[in-house]
């Protein structure tokens, strides 16, 4: 119940009054009557009962066991032949279904931090792969201009992730309030809008102009481009948000013959109606047009997506490193007639899959006490549990956790009262940290011991994104270009949900359409509570071993040598050796 409410905290959700958490229209509950009924049922639920939630509506309570999940959630699921955006929208209008995104409808969204480390891992790997021996960056993005679009709940992680990886970020969004929110939460350094500039350090808007000596235009876009190019040349890891449509930004860069080093996009193209904003409209105009003529709006939206991807491919031809960041924009452009839409790769096959082969993925935890000190204690213990010298990934974990702190030396000394977050917690204090098979269970048991000993004030909730090593089938994202061609097989996501139910997760969810839109993905999530009891310890051991093990099973079966080696090293039981 606390996590459901946390999803709708005004500091967490994008539009809490509409029950929208993030990702266009990803909701926590179908409507307010359903929300109230869920809360009332959870209050009276017995330890051996399980609540069933169908697309954000509580539909039944069944007798189970104390080791069974307290809640089972199914969101947005449709029989494949009818799994289209059009059918979904009709059912949603009738109040029969809800879009759960990934962590919105599964009650484990923790704000932009939830995707931050994964975004950092992506951009850091991009630097290592493409700039390891050139430009003096030492395999980082130092001195590199990284351009992207979409600064919402997910895309808003990009500016901070890029700067943490050493780069300069230029990001466009049509919604000025999103850019201002990211500045407030210290994910974004500066904003340029309507010819004015401000930063987190300067609250008053100040006039800013483009360099008229270099070009005639004096728009905000030109001013933002000039500023970002200058920062990159100076090697400054700063981020600039420009209030503009991403299409306009990219086309202006083409006009000015400016090629970014890295280019991607996280606009809400997974949802052509309520997410993406066509280039013809401002953010405010788009809201009106959706209501006036939804069919025309979708046509304009997909046409803009084609134009968007064409600009990305043109910049790729000019030398930019371009990758798709999982919003399905390539598919939308392809469906609209652009045959070269898949010219650039997705981020998972390009940078992340080697980690999936090891059962690594986005492990997150939340302090139910609401006290940031509890997170600082867990950070400190995580650094002890996984020494830096243990592996390259442990070293990265140390850099990541310390990078989350404004005063890392205070954390290292165990002076928790002197710790401050580098970026703001949203809602309940939380942390994200990528861990693999053989690590997640250790962390979970350690958290349980902290609760038991009283070193933290209240239980800790442990969950993850549905974007994980063995929990999703998404041919245009997580399972793109699988070695054996099994991209579209969703048995694995279903098995993941069943394994987590059998293992004793506190709540388990199975969704359709997260990240890339209706018809393009199926995925499972799990959450488990460390309450300090011996019974919880047994569940934690099972769940946090079996959940990442599904990633090793999945990738070993697909023929990945790293996954097979991981299975052998950790004595994973695979009946038919790959």
Each predicted region: which residue ranges?
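General beta-strand structural signal in soluble alpha/beta enzymes
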Residues: 50-55, 73-75, 148, 171-172, ...
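Catalytic or ion-translocation cores adjacent to nucleophile or general acid/base/metal-coordination motifs
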Residues: 101-107, 111-121, 128, 142-145, ...
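Short, solvent-exposed amphipathic alpha-helical segments in soluble enzyme
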Residues: 163-165, 254-259, 280-281, 338-341, ...
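Catalytic cofactor-binding cores of redox enzymes
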Residues: 9, 90, 97-100, 121, ...
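Short helix-terminating capping/connector loops at secondary-structure junctions
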Residues: 135-142, 232-236, 316-317, 455-456
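Core active-site phosphate/anionic-ligand binding loop and the adjoining beta-turn-alpha structural block
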Residues: 190-192, 222-443
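Short polybasic linear motifs
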Residues: 196-198, 202-206
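N-terminal ligand-binding/catalytic initiation module
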Residues: 1-118, 124-131, 135-137, 307, ...
């Amino acid at each position: 119940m606390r996590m459901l409410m946390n999803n709708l905290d005004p500091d967490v959700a994008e539009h809490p009054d509409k029950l929208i958490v993030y990702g266009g229209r990803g909701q926590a509950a179908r409507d307010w009557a359903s929300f109230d009924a869920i809360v009332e049922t959870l209050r009276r639920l017995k330890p051996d009962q399980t609540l069933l939630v169908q697309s954000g509506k509580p539909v039944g309570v069944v007798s189970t066991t104390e080791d069974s999940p307290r809640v089972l959630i199914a969101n947005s699921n449709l029989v494949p032949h009818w799994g289209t955006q059009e059918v979904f929208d009709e059912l949603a209008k009738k109040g029969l279904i809800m879009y759960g995104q990934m962590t919105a409808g599964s009650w484990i969204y923790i704000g932009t931090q939830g995707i931050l480390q994964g975004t950092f891992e992506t951009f850091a790997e991009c630097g290592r792969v493409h700039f390891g021996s050139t430009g003096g960056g030492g395999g980082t993005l130092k001195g590199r201009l990284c351009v992207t679009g979409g600064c919402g709940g997910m895309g808003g992680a990009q500016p901070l992730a890029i700067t943490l990886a050493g780069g300069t970020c230029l990001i466009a969004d049509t919604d000025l309030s999103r850019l201002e929110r990211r500045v407030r939460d210290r994910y974004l350094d500066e904003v340029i809008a309507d010819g004015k500039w401000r930063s987190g350090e300067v609250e008053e808007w100040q006039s800013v102009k483009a360099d008229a000596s270099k070009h005639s235009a004096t728009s905000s876009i030109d001013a933002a481009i000039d500023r970002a190019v200058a920062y990159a040349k100076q090697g400054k890891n700063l981020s600039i948000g420009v209030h503009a449509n991403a299409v306009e930004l990219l086309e202006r860069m083409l006009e000015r013959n400016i090629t970014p080093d890295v280019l991607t996009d996280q606009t809400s193209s997974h949802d052509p109606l309520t997410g993406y904003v066509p280039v013809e409209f401002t953010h405010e105009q788009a809201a009106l047009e959706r209501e006036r003529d939804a069919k025309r709006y979708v046509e304009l939206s997909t046409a803009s997506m084609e134009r968007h991807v064409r600009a990305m491919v043109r910049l790729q031809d000019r030398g930019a490193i371009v990758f798709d960041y999982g919003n399905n924009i390539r598919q939308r452009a392809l469906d609209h007639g652009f045959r070269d839409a898949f010219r650039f790769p997705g981020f998972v096959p390009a940078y992340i899959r080697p980690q999936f082969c090891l059962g690594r993925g986005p492990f997150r935890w939340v302090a139910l006490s609401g006290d940031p000190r509890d997170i600082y204690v867990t950070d400190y213990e995580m650094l002890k549990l996984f020494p830096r010298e243990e592996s390259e990934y442990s070293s990265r974990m140390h850099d990541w956790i310390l990078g989350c702190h404004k005063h890392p030396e205070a954390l290292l000394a165990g002076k928790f009262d002197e710790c401050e977050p580098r970026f703001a917690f949203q809602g309940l204090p939380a942390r994200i940290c990528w861990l693999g098979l053989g690590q997640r269970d250790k962390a979970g048991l350690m958290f349980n011991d902290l609760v038991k000993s009283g070193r933290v004030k209240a239980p800790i909730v442990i969950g993850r994104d549905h974007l994980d090593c063995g929990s999703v089938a998404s041919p245009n994202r997580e399972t793109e270009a699988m070695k054996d061609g099994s991209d579209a097989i969703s048995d694995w996501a279903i098995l993941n949900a069943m394994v987590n139910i059998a293992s004793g997760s506190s709540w388990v969810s199975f969704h359709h359409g997260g990240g890339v839109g209706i018809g393009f993905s199926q995925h499972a999530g799990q959450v488990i509570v460390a309450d300090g009891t011996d019974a919880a310890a047994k569940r934690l051991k099972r769940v946090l071993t079996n959940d990442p093990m599904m990633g090793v099973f999945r990738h070993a079966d697909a023929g990945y040598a790293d996954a097979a080696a991981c299975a052998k090293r950790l004595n994973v039981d695979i009946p038919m050796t790959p």
